């Protein structure tokens, strides 16, 4: 039994390392799988695609790179891209260097004497920006200038781009992105854990070698529990939220027995494991602060979509290979209608906010309560209203949440105690983060005084702990309890509408990021010599005929051999046919 676990872990680790070969986990046929269609095959896509500048040239990663390549080939446009790059660099510059970096931008791009002067930024705006730079430079100083540049680029340059070979290439990538996704798109590895409707296992995309976690939702189990709306809700929220602090949905597909969500794989284990199983319970405050900042950024991204998470607890915060965290398991998350409040007594005992326990109407407030619980537990090594391994009834834990104050040990600095106290305020109207500014108010608390959130969001800060790349941070294969067989449930055509809403294939932004991160984009995005069209982009050149399969080649070779060996006289041929006919009948009657 131990051997089975060792084998499963060894195979998984080898896959995570890229298989040890030059292809880094890619299939031998990866270029064939990702072969561009001829541009003539993309005409339907050209007619139906939403021609929005921000979607095509800014939000979508491959679209952004191709628009950049287009601008670099047009005289006078390259400086606009360089300006936007420098503004992005300015926004993650340490505060003490903002003045010098801002002056560099003003001199190089916003001065009429400069050879790369950007005239599209109005002189009044330039004067205002220069004045603010001298008074007190801030991260958002050049935001309005950058917007002016985008306003220019989305005009004539964007329309020229739509008629260029770079946009044609983007259509080819979109065609690949929209190809059907099945279980054969992936290699499957060991089970990592259990979800509400089925197992979670590691998987790898054959074409790119990228590792993911596949969350299987068994169709019969969903139907038996009437969990269709819950499963579809989680899928749609994951699809919409594109955050580096929340697990991303990359693919959604179905098999005969299950619906599958293919998600960011988090190899470093969950916070519960690290709080309680790595030395003394709890973290040093510096480490707790780093995780709290990343969790806060994840909540901010969810709240931007008007989505409340409702299940913050250590088990749902996962670490990746590098030690960064992501919020996982959005099964209880819900989108709040604009200008409305919701009601629902859901969550985990000891982490539910007072307004949830009292079944009151609420907005985003339960998530700030949950953040307070997490910060407290990371520092103290136990949750604020329940001792470690304390056996206590649910009703008693709920009473403590509603009536008692949390106790702070010497482990807490004044700033840590203050932020926990303000986040764990019983009255949600008085709670930190529950005013109009939301997460921005929490970020300004002295606890985060030394945290540069811009650099954190840009992935430029090193985590305080890096998981061991040779470790598998999950239970042994045989210790993960298996689901029992669902009986008495039949699937029929009435379920097909739900399955079609769920099984939508690739999710654009994660899929495009995958192509870039695995260097498939770099290797395949090739044009003709000296900026000319490649054959697959040449409308006047017919597409290559598809390669014949193995069986076709074998059949053709056999047919040629038979033709060479068959006798030429007609009588012989008839005799051979008759003989075969006789043999066939003889065989049939024996």
Curated annotation (Swiss-Prot):
Protein's organism:
Rattus norvegicus (Rat)
Return the protein name: G protein-coupled receptor kinase 5
Which family does the UniProt entry place this protein in? Belongs to the protein kinase superfamily. AGC Ser/Thr protein kinase family. GPRK subfamily.
Per UniProt, the ranges with Low complexity bias are: 572-590
Domain (RGS) spans 53-171
* Protein's gene: Grk5
Q: What is its main location?
A: cytoplasm
Residues forming the motif Nuclear localization signal are 388-395
Q: Which GO terms describe its molecular function?
A: ATP binding; beta-adrenergic receptor kinase activity; G protein-coupled receptor kinase activity; lipid binding; protein kinase activity; protein serine/threonine kinase activity
Q: Which PANTHER family match?
A: G PROTEIN-COUPLED RECEPTOR KINASE 5, G PROTEIN-COUPLED RECEPTOR KINASE/RIBOSOMAL PROTEIN S6 KINASE
- Tell me the compartments it is located in: Cytoplasm; Nucleus; Cell membrane
The entry's active site is 311
Highest taxon in the source lineage: Eukaryota
AGC-kinase C-terminal domain location, by residue? 449-514
């Amino acid at each position: 039994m131990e051997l089975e676990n060792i084998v499963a872990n060894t195979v998984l680790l080898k896959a995570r390392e890229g298989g040890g070969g030059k292809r880094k986990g890619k299939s031998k046929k990866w270029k064939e799988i990702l072969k561009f269609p001829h541009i003539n095959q993309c005409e339907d896509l050209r007619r139906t695609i939403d021609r929005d500048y921000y979607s095509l040239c800014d939000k979508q990663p491959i679209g952004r790179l191709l628009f950049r390549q287009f601008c670099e080939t047009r005289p006078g446009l390259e400086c606009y891209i360089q300006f936007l790059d420098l503004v992005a660099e300015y926004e993650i510059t340490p505060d003490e260097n903002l003045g010098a970096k801002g002056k560099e931008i003003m001199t190089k791009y916003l001065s009429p004497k400069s050879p790369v002067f950007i005239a599209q930024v109005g002189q009044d705006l330039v004067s205002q920006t220069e004045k603010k730079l001298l008074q007190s430079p801030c991260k958002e100083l050049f935001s309005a200038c950058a917007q002016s540049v985008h306003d220019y680029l989305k005009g004539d340059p964007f329309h020229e781009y739509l008629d260029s070979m770079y946009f044609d290439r983007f259509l080819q990538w979109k065609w690949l992105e929209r190809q059907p996704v099945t279980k054969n798109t992936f290699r499957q590895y060991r089970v990592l854990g259990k979800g509400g409707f089925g197992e979670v296992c590691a998987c790898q995309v054959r074409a790119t070698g990228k590792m993911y976690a596949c969350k299987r939702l068994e169709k019969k189990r969903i139907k038996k529990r009437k969990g269709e709306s819950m499963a579809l809700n989680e899928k749609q929220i994951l699809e919409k939220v594109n955050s580096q602090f929340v697990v991303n949905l990359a693919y959604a597909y179905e098999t005969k027995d299950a619906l599958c969500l293919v998600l960011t794989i988090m190899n470093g284990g969950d916070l519960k494991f690290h709080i309680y199983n790595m030395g003394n319970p709890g973290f040093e405050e510096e480490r707790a602060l780093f995780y709290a900042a990343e969790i806060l950024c994840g909540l901010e991204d969810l709240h931007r979509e008007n989505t409340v998470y409702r299940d913050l607890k250590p088990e749902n915060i996962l670490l990746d290979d590098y030690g960064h965290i992501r919020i996982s398991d959005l099964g209880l998350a819900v989108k709040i209608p604009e200008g409305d409040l919701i009601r629902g007594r859901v969550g985990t005992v000891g982490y539910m906010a007072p307004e949830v326990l009292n079944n009151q109407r609420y907005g985003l407030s339960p998530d700030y309560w949950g953040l307070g619980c997490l910060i407290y537990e990371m520092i103290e090594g136990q949750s604020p209203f329940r001792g470690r391994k304390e056996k206590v009834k649910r009703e008693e834990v709920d009473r403590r949440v509603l009536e008692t104050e949390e106790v702070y040990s010497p482990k807490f600095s004044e700033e840590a105690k203050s932020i926990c106290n303000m986040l764990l305020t019983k009255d949600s109207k008085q709670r930190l983060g529950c005013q109009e500014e939301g997460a921005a108010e929490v970020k300004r608390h002295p606890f985060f005084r030394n945290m540069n959130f811009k650099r954190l969001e840009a992935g430029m800060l090193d985590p305080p702990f890096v998981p061991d790349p040779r470790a598998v941070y999950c239970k042994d294969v045989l210790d993960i309890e298996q689901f029992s067989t669902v009986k008495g449930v039949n699937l029929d055509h009435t379920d097909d509408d739900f399955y079609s809403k769920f099984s939508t294939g690739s999710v654009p932004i994660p899929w495009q990021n995958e192509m870039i991160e695995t260097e498939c984009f770099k290797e395949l995005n090739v044009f003709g010599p000296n900026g000319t069209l490649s054959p697959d982009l040449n409308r006047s050149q017919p597409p290559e005929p598809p390669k014949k399969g193995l069986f076709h080649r074998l059949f053709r070779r056999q047919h040629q051999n038979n033709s060479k060996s068959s006798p030429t006289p007609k009588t012989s041929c008839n005799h051979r046919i008759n003989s075969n006919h006789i043999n066939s009948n003889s065989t049939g009657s024996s």
